[in-house]
Amino acid sequence: MYIERLQKKIGYQFANLDYLLQALTHRSAAAKNNERLEFLGDSILNYAIGQALFERFPQANEGELSRMRATLVREQTLAILARQFDLGEYMKLGAGELKSGGYRRESILSDCVEAIIAAIYLDAGMDKASERIYAWYQTLLDEMKPGDAQKDPKTRLQEFLQGRRLKLPEYEVLDIKGEAHNQIFKVSCKIETFTDIFIGIGTSRRKAEQNAAEQILLKLNK
């Protein structure tokens, strides 16, 4: 069953599959959708990441902790997790959202991740939800440092490469879909460290480039 593949990707098997199915349902598709779950999941995510940062950085002040948390729970970061799980393939969207490429939109993807967090919480409790969050965020948490959170992914990638006297990243717009007020950009990014080409998607060229850069940083564990 297709939903089994998703459960393997997120690392959790639901006792009550209805929670997961609701988490995957966008408001454009049904009255019983993931909006309330997204609200709850947002709170759970902020708590879990806040606790992790508090324990990992005993010397960091409140402002540094807040900035690091904001970086980890922002829409861009959640959308990257969503793409790692291929959530767009499993989401239930209305006809209009499907036509406009809603399954690629960062806001919809990030909301779905938060809804899944809430679904796990309702299915198995806070400990299990926190466990999954920490597993998904392991690399990002390990590499997070006070001060780095204020720098965007493109800046961090550029500084990483410059520090090793490597060529700067090459970005290229591959595709633009949608009307002027509702466009989806697809951008490629390549660096000499990898033969792979990384693809970023966003609602602007800048966001797409940031998305691609963040994927490279995850690959570099930086």
Swiss-Prot record:
Catalytic residues at D42, E114
Tell me if Kinase is a UniProt keyword of this record: no
Query: What does the entry list as the binding residues for Mg(2+)?
Result: E38, D111, E114
- Judging by the UniProt lineage, the source's domain of life is Bacteria
Which cysteines bridge via disulfide bonds?
none
SMART domains associated with the record: DSRM, RIBOc
Q: Is Metal-binding found in the keyword set?
A: yes
- What's the Enzyme Commission number for this chain? 3.1.26.3
Per UniProt, residues of the RNase III domain are: 3-125
One GO CC term on file:
cytoplasm
Name one matching Pfam family.
Answer: dsrm
Which residue ranges does the record assign to the DRBM domain?
152-222
Q: Some GO term, biological process aspect, for this entry: which one?
A: regulation of gene expression
Cofactors (names): Mg(2+)
Record's keyword terms, sorted: Cytoplasm, Endonuclease, Hydrolase, Magnesium, Metal-binding, mRNA processing, Nuclease, RNA-binding, rRNA processing, rRNA-binding, tRNA processing
- Where does it reside? Cytoplasm
Q: Give one GO term, molecular function aspect.
A: metal ion binding
Q: Which reaction does it catalyse?
A: Endonucleolytic cleavage to 5'-phosphomonoester
Q: What does this protein do?
A: Digests double-stranded RNA. Involved in the processing of primary rRNA transcript to yield the immediate precursors to the large and small rRNAs (23S and 16S). Processes some mRNAs, and tRNAs when they are encoded in the rRNA operon. Processes pre-crRNA and tracrRNA of type II CRISPR loci if present in the organism.
Per the record, the similarity remark reads:
Belongs to the ribonuclease III family.
Q: How does it assemble?
A: Homodimer.
For this protein, the record's NCBIfam families field holds: RNaseIII
- Name of the protein described by the UniProt record: Ribonuclease 3
* Upper lineage: Bacteria, Pseudomonadati, Pseudomonadota, Gammaproteobacteria, Pasteurellales
